[in-house]
Amino acid sequence: MKLIISEKEIAAKRIAGILSGDGQKEEKVYGVPVYYIKHGSDECAVIGLKGHILKVDFPKEYSNWFKVDPVDLIDAEIEKTPIHKNIVQALKKVAGNASEVIIATDFDREGELIGYDAWQVAIEKNSLLNAKRAKFSALTNSDIDSAFAKLEKLDLNLAFAGRARQDIDLIWGAVLTRFISLASYQVKENFLSVGRVQSPTLTLIVDREIEIGEFVAIPYWVVNIKLKTDRGEEFEATHKKKRFLKKEEASKAFSKISGEGEVLDVNETIRSMAPPTPFNTTSLIVSANSIGFTAAKTINIAENLYMNGYISYPRTDNTVYPASIDLKEIVKMLKVSDSFADACSDVLKQSKITPSRGKKRTTDHPPIYPTFSVSRQRLGSDEWKLYELIVRRFLCTLLPPGQIKSIAANINVGGEVFVANGSNIIKENWIKHYHYYKHEDVYIPNLVPGQKLKIIDREMLDKETKPPARYTQGKLVEKMEELGLGTKATRHTIIQTLISRGYITGNPLVPSEKAIAVVKILKKHAEKISSPDMTSELEMDMDGIARGDETREEVVEKSREMLKDVMVNLKNVKADISQEIKKAVKEDFIIGKCRQKDCDGNLIVRVSKKSRKRFIGCNAYPKCTSTFSLPQLGMILTTKDKCKHCDYPVIRIITKGRKPWDLCINGDCPGKDEKYKNYKSKKPGQESSD
């Protein structure tokens, strides 16, 4: 019997169905579904894991934060321990009757490690088991049949690269998190997370916030006019200078506007709008962010679509379709859907289909593309939105460029030159079917040199330069990729970790005071941790392991030596770290200024000595007894925002498994419904601060 191991139970069921023609027999082994099938002449058992079934950890003697010096963890032994004991038991039991293991996990660094670990567990029961590899990029009949027809060797170097990543992240994360948390007395549920990838990522967000805070707006002035032709057509023009940095210059130009204008020249250009490139993981996250999806939500939904056989593997860097994909057949398959029939027809009527190409080309997986035509009714609302985005992107990569005509007319008004710009799409092509791309036509009438125009209005606007925008999750993932922070499989989880730790909130992302303090400390005393350079270097070393150029032991030892250098500096400034972080944590607990008359106190999160319930109270207690009730579950974060209905402070609640939500602390806020006012919130003064 052959033992086939997949990464998830849903994938196991699908693979079993494809290989057996839906002739699988399901049995539960220690509560784990195992699918027994016949594939050709071979009897097989197919079992699905839950991702990693083993984790790395230090021996138990290192578990006490208060008794173990964090530095001692750097050279400590690392163990592998079970995460899902029932799956480990089931794997061993089934392996006892197996003659061969076939690894059918996702083909990437993490998938190879998951498969390797499962093989090692199976070997504990049956030491004679050899392992082979089934490589595929889609859970479709053709891909699975092809993969099992030409099994390959397990890529041990790729698995060892994944193990190196586990070891390094454990060492760096445990040592730095324990040291910073203990130094600032932020332990147990209040610990301060620091990590090899998350800290430089957090630094990007904090640096942008500091840049915004230090931004000094520069005033400028814009002069516009409104014109009318003798045919009654109205349009607008802006002074050629666009921005006047001196008000007197803008006023001078403005004062010359009177009477009529004369067209000096008209220039027309036609530019080509290239179709979008095929989706890889990063570009999918960026595009999905524009329709309201977080990075984690995008990957989770994409993973589900992949597991159900609707799209190809969603973790890929590739942006070039390989020749092995029959693009035309996929379009024909999609044409049966009313939602995409029009776009499919436009693709198929071309004499030759020439797909667009991105800059990145890899051989492990193709770009993300649809593998099955599924109806809207079979998917949830969010699943359909992402599936539709992927399908439309795929179809648009197969369509010709669009064409946009731009018109620029220079107009003389009192010796000052104004420019009227117009543009309109003259050939839609892919633009017609990709409604995520927005182009607003700007109308100006047909003009000729020497034509006289009546001035019907004028304006001089006071404006100022804007600070750089905060990172959205999509843009942050893009920046992380650019700097070599994390991988396509881990970037979204890094962002989620920063959110769950209370370091960042919202989208665009805003750092907490605690986050700003941690980053400032790291930049001041351990710049290697906050810089992307060290992390990027280690990522390249792990790629070297995958290529066979370096060993896991060499790279892990190199990272240990790096960390030892960092810890020498940090231990010398432990007292400074303690003071700076304690101050920042205190700032994070300030909800806002007290609203009571003649009180200068701050509203802070407190805990009742009697009920042990948390509430918001004034730090001027007992002089001021103002209080507000709070939800008792979830992490509370300050937002610095004021309620638009009552001007009271707004807080953000983060609860595991729920979308973060904002709450006005005022129980009598006119923006809250009566049910909430009566049952969920108390008036100021109702919660004792004893």
Where are these regions (language model features)?
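Metal- or metallocofactor-binding catalytic centers and their adjacent structured scaffolds
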Residues: 244-277, 285, 451
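C-terminal or mid-to-C-terminal helical accessory/interaction module adjacent to the motor/catalytic core
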Residues: 83, 96-97, 139-224, 268-272
